[in-house]
């Protein structure tokens, strides 16, 4: 079970905080569990691990099995919360090199998360003539990046299989009742899965948004959802035995005492895209009204050779949260080298996991001594159950954190600014006057 250790952060606080924060945490927890807080129309994720739609869940498993049987590749089209969680889980549990490994499941390509011509062309070339399917994920169907990518891959499918057969290879995860993608899916007969109205994109990993690609990769969804339900039960406790309470409280107090950025660190490279998901989760949920810790991530030990200098001796505005996994089942042992030219024979016979753990502990002590508070998240294993626990833990703590800040943890009004400018510069109907003004400013 996930556990939290705040002992390397509490010494940075000038006053005890638990008793003072308790009433505010109780209120925040009440808003998450019962509604009444800002954005309460979007708290469906809170009970999702218990109350998910069993019928749709069965259809997800059936669709995943079909894709595994008729496709060598699945193209997942989505941006932000529509793909980061799924990619994070797949890479963490199945490997960042998933597509290069020998396996019985299809390759999975994530696209529609940017506007790069090179990225789009590369995925098209990698698929080549292989049989493939598409999972397009968009609540509205009009978000620029995924909508443009879907045009390309829908055309490729229809040219390869014909319109009728192509429709059997397109899976639309979208709004249950409205929107451009919903209308197209109804018209063309695509199999449809639902983006729930009461769950925002960054909180949607455990809905069809994340579950279909994750299932195609061969991850055990029962274990994933089981882990999330275990953490849901633990997070329902309104006291400091709840790890989400501890995490939200410590982050909030460190923020109040001047910390401005939080680094999420892990000593396993496979965790990279889980950290990308975490960055969106906390960045969009807290970063408003000129408030919030800036979420960043580092891959250790690699980034100790790039960002390590700043973390150790740069401006003292950082805090760190470190995710630690239990030792790997398959151990790599350092061989003995008779020449010992590198002077590393003192490591011979030791496992890489042992060496990595000494690096973790050494880094922890150095950073804390250097003025960087550390929160440790310990996971028993790197498997589907613990991943479900971690996802729910981060989501619940994020909701608490947003309410402690006094912001709405479930909206993201700031992301519209760039979109309006982009539409104006692209000549979208209705934006002509704005486009002229922006072009003048760019001269």
Task: Label every PLM stretch briefly.
Residues 91-94, 125-127, 151-153, 186-188, ...:
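Short, solvent-exposed amphipathic alpha-helical segments in soluble enzyme
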Residues 363-426:
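C-terminal helical cap and adjacent loop that interface with cofactors, partners, or active-site loops
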Residues 1-68, 336-342, 346, 434-443:
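Extended, charge-enriched "interface" segments that sit outside catalytic cores
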Residues 296-383:
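Helicase-primase coupling helices
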Residues 59-72, 123-131, 250-260, 311-316:
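Glycine-rich phosphate/diphosphate-binding loops that line cofactor/substrate pockets in enzymes
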Residues 65-238, 424:
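Glycine-rich phosphate-binding loops that contact phosphosugars or nucleotide phosphates
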Residues 161-321, 326-329, 412-443:
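Active-site phosphate/pyrophosphate-binding segments
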Residues 62, 117-125, 248-251, 324, ...:
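Short, charged beta->alpha transition segments
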